């Protein structure tokens, strides 16, 4: 059955992939994005099949206009990228919290009673158990560390979605993606950053092992999920998920950050020598979802 769906942050990395999948599924899709972080080129393949509204998620009137006439809202608009967490935590929280308030208010005003929220594995910070299931505590270990602006904002968003959802929505679903990667993901994340750095080092050092700086000793692990797999998981959740349900979307293969660097270097036929440097406060040693 075709639905009218608003995707906020729809020109972003994950948002655009979701938009394309929804269009392929026969849905009528509207996108709200100010393209401050997203890129219109990501939607070129479907630009004739969607309605695009240029607007800031913090602008209540823009959000209200975008929500009006929809059957459901998929809220993905946010500021991602570790550098922003440390350098612009006020922006991260402004977009995250105001955006969530505006989406809920607009849905209530327009009687849109279906909401899907993109959360994050960052809500766990350092989880007490790995693999981590969806019932693990959500914490902000140090409110003075700007690193937690992102995870803290996501926790607030989840609390709002769940508690408003009990009274004002028929269906609220939350997904927590884990370290998503794929084409055109931008340069704010570990895989593309490593590619750029290794390319530069290879040009500077035509032979021999590449001196590669890494936070700590590179033993920190993550479970990376391709964006296409993430979208498939979100669509399954949309179809089968329970009201007020929270779902991990990811894989269970843990890979060390050092191994990520080694694999990228190997594609260029090079070896690397790690140069450890201090990791910023607030990092997580292990992150892997329980997806059972």
Mark where each language-model region is.
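N-terminal Rossmann-like NAD(P)+-binding domain of SDR-like oxidoreductases, especially those catalyzing
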Residues: 1-180
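A glycine/serine/threonine-rich, flexible loop-to-helix segment
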Residues: 129-132, 187-195
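A short, amphipathic alpha-helix embedded in the catalytic core of nucleotide-handling enzymes
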Residues: 103, 164, 193-198, 233-237
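C-terminal substrate-binding subdomain of Rossmann-fold SDR/epimerase-dehydratase oxidoreductases
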Residues: 18-24, 55, 200-292
């Amino acid at each position: 059955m075709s639905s009218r769906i608003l995707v906020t942050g729809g020109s972003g990395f994950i948002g655009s992939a979701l938009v394309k999948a929804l269009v392929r599924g026969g849905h009528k899709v509207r996108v709200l994005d100010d393209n401050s972080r997203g890129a219109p080129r990501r939607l070129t393949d479907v630009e004739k099949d969607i309605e695009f509204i240029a607007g800031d998620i913090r602008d209540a009137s823009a959000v209200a206009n975008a929500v009006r006439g929809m059957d459901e809202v998929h809220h993905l608009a946010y500021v991602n990228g570790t550098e922003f967490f440390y350098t612009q935590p006020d922006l991260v929280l402004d977009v995250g919290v105001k955006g969530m308030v505006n989406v809920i208010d607009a849905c209530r005003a327009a009687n849109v009673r279906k909401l899907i929220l993109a959360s994050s594995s960052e809500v766990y910070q350092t989880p007490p158990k790995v693999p981590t299931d969806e019932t693990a505590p959500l914490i902000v270990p140090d409110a003075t560390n700007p690193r937690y602006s992102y995870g803290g904002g996501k926790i607030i968003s989840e609390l709002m979605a769940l508690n408003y959802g009990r009274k004002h929505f028929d269906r609220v679903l939350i997904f927590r993606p884990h370290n998503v990667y794929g084409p055109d993901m931008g340069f704010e994340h570990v895989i593309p950053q490593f590619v750029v750095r290794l390319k530069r080092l290879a040009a500077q050092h035509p032979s021999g092992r590449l001196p590669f700086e890494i936070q700590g000793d590179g033993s920190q692990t993550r479970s990376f999920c391709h964006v296409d797999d993430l979208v498939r998981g979100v669509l399954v959740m949309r179809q089968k998920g329970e009201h007020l349900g929270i779902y991990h979307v990811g894989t269970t293969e843990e890979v060390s950050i050092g191994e990520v660097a080694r694999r990228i270097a190997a594609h260029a036929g090079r070896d690397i020598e790690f140069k450890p440097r201090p990791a910023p406060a607030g990092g997580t040693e292990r992150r892997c979802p329980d997806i059972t």
